[in-house]
Amino acid sequence: MNVNYLNDSDLDFLQHCSEEQLANFARLLTHNEKGKTRLSSVLMRNELFKSMEGHPEQHRRNWQLIAGELQHFGGDSIANKLRGHGKLYRAILLDVSKRLKLKADKEMSTFEIEQQLLEQFLRNTWKKMDEEHKQEFLHAVDARVNELEELLPLLMKDKLLAKGVSHLLSSQLTRILRTHAAMSVLGHGLLRGAGLGGPVGAALNGVKAVSGSAYRVTIPAVLQIACLRRMVSATQV
């Protein structure tokens, strides 16, 4: 089965990601909370992608297919079939921002909207952290302050915001997504805790659930894309 990738300048940077980065990102898209392949995954049914299983650059050589998978999850399944492809990344980003109650200015660049989203996500998560989680986070970003308002300027200055959010995603959200249903109350109007434990789940509490897009996939995926973009950018400076 083909993955129809819509040329997207906001996702072109994925070609510069490492094999490990792309493999981790692809798994977030293709596998559900139990570690099983999502029934709606197109990538895992793609003959080219499957034929390269075990190849040391399976994901790097197929970055466009991975990007297409994100576009696929970002669009309504019926609309995807009608137009033959999913949504552009920016539309997915704006959609996720709205669900996370971020009033994004559409005149802002994609990078700027992502920056606001990462900051808001960190703020919301920090409020839900206990002292142990906070200390673990501070250690991960090598910070020696204890208050968020002191921490944020340091993260911005040293370009560590993406590293901090990436730590939260890898240490909590990704792990939790593998063991719990990420959208436990579909139809009840809320992504109540998103089926997620700990401060990450609590930070996403209250996110509206609608049938159009797979928010259990696109919310962590957009956060991860924002982190990857900054990591790649840092290596190219």
Curated annotation (Swiss-Prot):
Signal sequence residues: none
Pfam family name, one: DUF3944
InterPro entries with a match to the protein in the record: DUF3944, Ubiq_cyt_c_chap
The family this protein is said to belong to: Belongs to the UPF0174 family.
Family annotation (NCBIfam families): PRK10236.1
UniProt name for this protein: UPF0174 protein YaaW
Species the sequence originates in: Escherichia coli (strain K12)
